[in-house]
Amino acid sequence: MENNNEDKGAIRMIVPIPCADKFFRLWLEVLKPQHQLTDRETDLLAAFVAKRHELQRTNLSQDMIDAILMSSQSKKEIRKSVKISTAYFQRIMAKFRKRDILIPDSNIKGGKINPRYIPVLKDDDKNIGILFMFIDPNGT
């Protein structure tokens, strides 16, 4: 763990967390106050975000990535990987739309994942880095 005190009393720390396949699930746990999904729903969203990240490693446009992610073939693969029934999958997808986790896009049937739930990653094939800034609401 690296701790670097810089100007104005800011504390910066690097904390390595081995998480491999659980990264996107952990990311969504941090965002739980925003989405308030159940564990099973969070697992499904994490599978979508992980698949999207995998697709981002290609040279495809963002629109193409979103279209592939929301294709019936990708949805079926993701549903099977999370081991949920088709009916339950459809209920969760409806809930995602209702809560703006999936947002409308005229080019993509069923919408696309709200960028709020997609982490902006610095990806070097071995490590994924995310910067969290916890801001004091009182400004102190």
Predicted regions and their residues:
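Eukaryotic partner-binding/assembly regions in large regulatory complexes
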Residues: M1-G9, I103, Y117-D123
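Short helix->loop/beta-hairpin flanking segments within DNA-binding domains
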Residues: L37-Q73
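Short glycine/proline-centered loop/turn elements that form peptide/ligand docking sites
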Residues: S71-Q73, Y88-R91, G111-N114
